[in-house]
Amino acid sequence: MLERFKLLLRDMNRGIYEKETEISLSLLAALAGESVILLGPPGVAKSMVARQLKCAFRGARNFEYLMSRFSTPDEIFGPVSIQKLKTSDTYERAVDGYLPTADVVFLDEIWKAGPAIQNTLLTVINEKLFRNGIREIELPLKLLVAASNELPAKGEGLEALWDRFVIRIESRPIRQEKNFREMLLEVKSEAGGQCSAAEGKANSNAITAEEYAEWSKAIDRIGVKEEVLDAISAIRKSLRAVNVDEAAERRHVYVSDRRWKNIMRLLRTSAFMQDRAEVAVCDLLPIYHCLWQEPEERDAIRALVIKALFAPHADKLVEMKNALAEDIKYHRIRRSPDEGRDYEGEIE
């Protein structure tokens, strides 16, 4: 299983520069049934990342839309069916080809959408359900990726939708000079991120619908070690007083109970992808992407996550450090053979 995921990630990263974190965490989210938001300036390949994710699933249907304050629910969830209104006086949407029938969804500029769209997305993301007239339909949705170059405005009731995006990633421009030059010289026909439905079907590493359903049940059976729960408790406690700025007071970073539950699903999925029957402490390393509320909190939270993971071994590390210091302080210097003896003592 691990080797297959490595090959799949290799295929998905081909022709895309420095987006390994975005793609690997998005695949993790897709297998866990969670959603991702990419934050970053325009032109940093956020949409390209989302398009590559449909390549992970054989025969996947995708839907993408650029939001604006003028976007209507019809554009996202499908127009009202005139035929249904005429023949049976039923208010239903013609959903084929729109979000309710897609496996992978990409919504750009998510915070520009109006309340009617955003409120419907709450149920879509969390329960994978969509109410179409008097019927409630189960969605085939495996992953919803949203993108924005700004955080949700405060005081406008967007906190619930923001909380639904379990993984939050800051997407940045290309930093390595070598990759930047390769990108400049790349012609359009060679560019990555243009996976077609046919390519998704042809990819032998792509995940089938049957495998996805089977793996979802297998992920539920993954165990959790006690030391993982101890580490999570330590992280949760540390979030009550995060030192973001030395000059400012420590802040309480709030993480909802629902969010912690979704994070545990990610951890189980991580263990499954690595052929393990139990979640290990190492699976916790990327969860700082799930915990921050403001971008400036990210590095501080990453540091406290690492500290919590290594805290149980701190005493042993100190003991090893002290022993090493003693070995350096006192060591044996062998003199030349004709002097006939060794010297052992403290080296100043």
Q: For each of these PLM feature ranges, what is it?
A:
Residues E18, S26, L38, I76, ...:
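Conserved RecA-like P-loop NTPase ATPase core
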